[in-house]
């Protein structure tokens, strides 16, 4: 830092910030000698008690300090990972601190720049240092004035709801609540956060990751994206081979374990249709599952189970429903008294059975909810943030701290999810064997453009899974193998 200017550089990218007003004056792609920023601009904003403030609206520079890069998700390496380095990635990290005397707020801007990788991480934190409570409506993790070379910048955040982006619509390369407003790039939730801070309490913005491409070639760019995920979310390299078991009997579980151990599969997941109940608190039931899972562990097989967290277009039990403005019930709300109890129940199952994996069907997809008496959010506008925070961020953090593998059909990798679908339609499993193989090859080809192979799962239905009869089955394999 020199004369009020902070410079972060690693030979691939360089970002220069004036501490006065926290204004980014340069964001340069050193691989191509291209400048992205058109004009200096405060690189955050925060809305407090209904009013929006940027870095130039009363925030005074207090200090900056070098800090270690953060382990954002608890990480435990497994034998089936192909992780390419340590986590968190080595690099440089700084925190720039500001005070707003009138609001009695301390604001911290955190930048991380990683060695050998053209990626910058940015997050903003707001702390109440006054006596009165304040409400933080929304925080923009990053704001940049960019009109040229937009296609050289890929922006992702942990505030995610997409199943996949497949690399097919990447004209702006800004996804997951990173959006352009004319010439401004803003990384912020689409709706308000609505977090009340008492004295001494702190809230963090969503986390932005910004990758500067080194090439114009489309497929090479996607290779760079995949390389970024391997470094900032190394759990997504866990390329475990798992078997979906559709039975809950002890004998069937032990038989599946024996078969997996014999052929080299590494995990058994009691899947949809198995009858497993991860919400059960019955001690006798949990002890039976524990004994079956212990048998799997003795054979070197990781064990897990399926749970339905969220589903659209059904009428849930009263109290946990997400409500439209017209009062119609469209799905569960994952910020209710019920959802908190649900998460506790599933976590208890994992703790008491020794499960290594959980298959979360219907992870939160950013649906909105009008709220009600049993809801842990205020209204429609803050429902998205609070559901995401409770059902994704906090829960996944707790699961990863236990070393649990998370199989979930949504793009929650930056919060700890290991794998999502590589692309499929369940009805395809009712097609003839030959057609299933053709369809699967199409999905695997397209689905690995924008994600690493280890980030996606697909199925080979040995038995009838979705209809189709004998022509859709691969068992018996000796009879149905292809010449």
Where are the model-predicted features located?
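Acidic-aromatic substrate-binding/catalytic surfaces of carbohydrate-active enzymes
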Residues: 3-86, 91-95
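An acidic- and aromatic-residue-enriched active-site/binding cleft used to recognize and process polar
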Residues: 13, 129, 139-141, 273-275, ...
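Conserved structural scaffold segments of CAZyme catalytic domains across common CAZy folds
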Residues: 55, 59-317, 340
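An active-site-proximal structural segment forming one wall of the substrate-binding cleft
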Residues: 248-249, 259, 334-361
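Conserved beta-strand positions
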Residues: 270-271, 355, 360-362, 408
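Substrate-binding/active-site clefts of carbohydrate-active enzymes
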Residues: 284, 288-290, 300-346, 368-380
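Alpha-helix-loop-beta-strand connector modules within alpha/beta enzyme cores
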Residues: 288-301, 383-404
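Glycan-recognition surfaces
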Residues: 312-325, 329, 333-337, 344, ...
């Amino acid at each position: 830092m020199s004369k009020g200017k902070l410079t972060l550089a690693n030979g691939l990218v360089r970002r220069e910030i004036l501490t006065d007003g926290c204004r980014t004056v340069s964001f340069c792609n050193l691989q191509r000698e291209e400048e992205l920023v058109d004009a200096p601009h405060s690189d955050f904003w925060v809305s407090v008690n209904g009013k929006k403030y940027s870095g130039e609206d009363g925030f005074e520079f207090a200090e900056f300090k070098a800090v270690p890069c953060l382990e954002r998700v608890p990480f435990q390496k497994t034998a089936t990972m192909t992780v390419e380095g340590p986590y968190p990635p080595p690099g440089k990290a700084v925190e720039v601190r500001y005070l707003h005397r009138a609001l009695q707020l301390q604001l911290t801007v955190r930048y991380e720049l990683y060695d050998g990788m053209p990626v910058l991480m940015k997050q903003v934190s707001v702390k109440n240092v006054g006596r009165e409570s304040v409400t933080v409506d929304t925080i923009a993790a990053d704001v940049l004035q960019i009109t040229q070379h937009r296609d050289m910048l890929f922006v992702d955040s942990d505030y995610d709801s997409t199943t996949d982006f497949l690399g097919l619509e990447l004209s702006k390369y800004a996804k997951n609540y990173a959006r352009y407003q004319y010439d401004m790039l803003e990384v912020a939730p689409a709706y308000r956060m609505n977090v009340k801070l008492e004295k001494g309490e702190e809230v963090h913005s969503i986390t932005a990751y910004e990758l500067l491409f080194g090439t114009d070639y489309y497929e090479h760019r996607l290779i760079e994206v995949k390389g970024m995920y391997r470094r900032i979310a190394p759990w997504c390299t866990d390329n475990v081979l798992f078997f979906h078991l559709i039975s809950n009997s002890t004998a069937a579980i032990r038989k599946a374990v024996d078969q997996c151990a014999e052929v080299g599969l590494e995990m058994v997941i009691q899947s949809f249709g198995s009858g497993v109940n991860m919400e059960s608190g019955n001690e006798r039931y949990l002890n039976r599952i524990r004994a079956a899972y212990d048998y799997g562990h003795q054979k070197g097989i990781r064990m897990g189970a399926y749970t339905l967290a969220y589903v659209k277009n059904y009428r849930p039990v009263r109290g946990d429903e997400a409500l439209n403005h017209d009062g119609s019930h469209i799905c569960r709300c994952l910020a209710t008294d019920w959802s908190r109890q649900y998460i506790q129940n599933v976590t208890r199952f994992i703790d008491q059975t020794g499960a290594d994996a959980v298959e979360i069907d219907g992870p939160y997809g950013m649906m909105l909810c009008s709220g009600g008496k049993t809801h842990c959010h205020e209204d429609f506008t803050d429902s998205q943030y609070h559901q995401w925070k409770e059902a994704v961020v906090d829960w996944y953090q707790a699961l990863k701290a236990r070393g649990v593998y998370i199989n979930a059909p949504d793009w929650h990798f930056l919060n700890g999810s290991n794998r999502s679908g590589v692309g499929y339609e369940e009805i395809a499993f009712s097609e003839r064997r030959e057609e299933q193989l053709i369809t699967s090859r199409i999905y695997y080809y397209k689905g690995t453009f924008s994600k690493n192979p280890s980030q996606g799962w697909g199925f080979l239905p040995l038995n009838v899974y979705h209809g189709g009869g004998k022509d859709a089955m691969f068992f018996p394999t000796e009879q149905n193998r292809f010449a």
